[in-house]
């Protein structure tokens, strides 16, 4: 088979990088929001996991949830409510639909989360698998938060980090 060129080519372990030609940013506020999560390591070994939402027009950080456990689907639903209330006050349903762009993490793609999003007027959208650049705005925010806030502020324990998060996000905005 080798002599006749019939063997399959060996896999070298690297993946072909997915090229993203789409556009995350939009020209008007409240058209598309993006969300992602990150982990902050504390000096004492604790980890704080944070999920956040940004407007894809003005990049405003509109809401966040933080926990020392894993981010759950319920946390993401709470984030959706907090984000909607941040922009529009207490409403049951958005007047016009807004896209909610996220990766394919289990809390985001959970059936209850997607149904809840549609019930309040959000349109859940996910990025292609293995394509973090498709949610580049959220990925850039993660890098900014870690570089400009986490690295230069004390992070002795989870409680301190969780208490500082609102101040960091206010300063970012």
Over which residues does each language-model region extend?
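Charged DNA-binding/catalytic regions of mobile-element recombinases
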Residues: 1-173
């Amino acid at each position: 088979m080798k002599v006749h060129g019939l063997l399959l080519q060996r896999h070298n372990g690297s993946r072909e990088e997915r090229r993203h030609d789409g556009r995350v940013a939009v020209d008007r506020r409240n058209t598309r929001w993006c969300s992602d999560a990150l982990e902050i390591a504390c000096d004492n070994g604790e980890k704080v996991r944070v999920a956040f939402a940004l407007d894809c027009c003005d990049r405003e950080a509109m809401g966040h949830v933080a926990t020392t456990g894993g981010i759950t689907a319920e946390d993401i639903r709470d984030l959706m409510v907090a984000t909607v209330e941040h922009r529009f006050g207490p409403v049951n349903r958005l007047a016009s639909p807004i896209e909610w762009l996220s990766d394919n993490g289990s809390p985001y793609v959970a059936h209850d989360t997607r149904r809840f999003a549609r019930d309040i007027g959000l349109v859940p959208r996910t990025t292609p698998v293995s394509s973090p650049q498709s949610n580049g705005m959220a990925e850039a925010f993660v890098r900014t938060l870690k570089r400009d806030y986490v690295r230069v502020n004390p992070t002795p324990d989870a409680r301190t980090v969780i208490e500082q998060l609102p101040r960091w996000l206010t300063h970012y905005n």
